[in-house]
A protein has these predicted regions:
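Short, acidic/small-residue loops that bind anionic groups at enzyme active sites
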Residues: 141-162, 178-186
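Glycine-rich phosphate/diphosphate-binding loops that line cofactor/substrate pockets in enzymes
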Residues: 36, 108-121
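Internal, active-site/partner-interface "lid" segment
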Residues: 32, 174-206
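N-terminal phosphate-binding or glycine-rich loops at protein starts, especially the Walker A/P-loop
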Residues: 2-64
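N-terminal glycine-rich anion-binding loop in soluble enzyme alpha/beta folds
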Residues: 41-106
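Short, charged beta->alpha transition segments
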Residues: 103-114, 139-143
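Short glycine-rich or small-residue beta-strand-to-loop segments that form or flank ligand, phosphate
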Residues: 120-128, 154-157, 171
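Short Gly/Thr/Asp-enriched flexible loops that form oxyanion-binding sites at enzyme active sites
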Residues: 125-148, 166-169
């Protein structure tokens, strides 16, 4: 590697570190304001592709989606149990990865816990266009409403996956911090989700 190429690589890495640090600081500020307000419990899932430090700083619950590799099922837990490096190295080596939806039972467990706490809850769910999980979430939410008629729980199809869903979720935290109620947040999200778009490229069709 030439000195100029090495210098450019170092600069790019430093810029990425600075950007991540700035995002974490902003997320921490939003998280403090969101929790201080305390009137909405926002839940998201791992298909929003949160940077782990941002999710921790915001303090929102992230439901992990399952994926399966040759050694069995794993939880997409924001790289806690398997690093991003190890995951993609296995894929580059030819590992076949499949995914599956979150079960109604898992959603029921999460929503029952939220009902016990009593704070109105909004789940920004991975879009129905790519997964049946939102149907499972709505089924679980209906069961919780039956058991707890006074508890407010809403399931919103976020329409957009990956980083676009992350942006929507971060802005939702901001809206709660600014004072929106759960019902108002749902109305906001059902409109705002159409203003966020994601673009993807593929290395191959394998």
């Amino acid at each position: 590697m030439s000195s100029s190429t090495e210098s450019a690589a170092v600069t790019a890495a430093e810029n990425e570190v600075d950007t991540n640090a700035q995002a974490s600081r902003e997320a921490a500020r939003l998280g403090r304001a969101y929790h201080a307000r305390g009137n909405v419990n926002l839940i998201v899932d791992s298909c929003a592709d949160f940077a782990p430090e941002v999710a921790r700083a915001l303090g929102v619950e992230v439901i992990p989606f399952p994926y399966v590799m040759s050694d069995g099922e794993h939880a997409d837990d924001l790289w806690e149990t398997m690093s991003a490096h190890d995951f993609y190295e296995r894929m580059r080596a030819g590992e076949h990865v499949t995914t599956s939806a979150v079960t109604p039972g898992h959603y029921l467990e999460v929503f029952e816990r939220a009902a016990a706490e009593g704070t109105p809850t909004v789940y920004l769910a991975f879009t129905r266009g790519l997964s049946s999980s939102v149907d499972a979430a709505r089924q679980a939410a209906d069961m919780v409403r039956e058991a707890h008629p006074d508890f407010q729980i809403y399931v919103v199809d976020n329409v957009c996956p990956s980083a676009a869903a992350e942006l929507l979720a971060i802005e939702a935290v901001r809206q709660v911090a600014n004072g929106l109620t759960a019902a108002e947040l749902v109305a906001w999200a059902e409109e705002a989700r159409y203003y966020v778009h994601g673009y993807f490229t593929l290395d191959s069709f394998d």
